[in-house]
């Protein structure tokens, strides 16, 4: 790994939707480094056309843990429509036997459940497979 790439990394990012897909992340966030699958307890995956999550006692939100640079974060902010469509925060994630805080995005406006497109679902399933997330 190049030393300049290590210096550019500054944020742990938890992806649970399209950004679990390694092909998409390599285009969107070229400095990103995939660490592995991770989870957030007492939350679950929901859909409002695209992936979102909600608090749900006893559930587990599965996702991919990445290291991203500040440039990657700015790119994600634009892509996720931050702060109008998605907001971002830090939550505790479980990564193996370790617990750490990671950034993630959540939709600002809470709408009713709506099914994602078949293309979105395909990319999401591929991302879960690439990220070794068991569904």
Task: Specify the residue positions occupied by each region the protein language model found.
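Glycine-aromatic micro-motifs
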Residues: 2-135
């Amino acid at each position: 790994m190049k030393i300049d790439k290590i210096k550019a990394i500054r944020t742990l990012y938890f992806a649970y939707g399209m950004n679990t897909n390694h092909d998409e992340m390599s285009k969107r966030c070229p400095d990103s480094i995939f660490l592995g699958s991770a989870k957030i307890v007492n939350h679950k995956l929901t859909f409002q056309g695209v992936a979102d999550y909600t608090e749900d006692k006893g559930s587990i939100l599965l996702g991919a843990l990445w290291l991203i640079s500040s440039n990657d974060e700015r790119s994600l902010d634009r892509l996720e429509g931050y702060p109008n469509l998605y907001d971002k925060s830090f939550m505790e994630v479980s990564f193996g036997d370790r617990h750490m805080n990671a950034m993630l995005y959540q939709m600002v406006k809470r709408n009713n459940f709506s099914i994602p497109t078949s293309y979105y679902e395909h990319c999401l399933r591929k991302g879960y497979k690439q990220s070794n997330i068991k569904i």
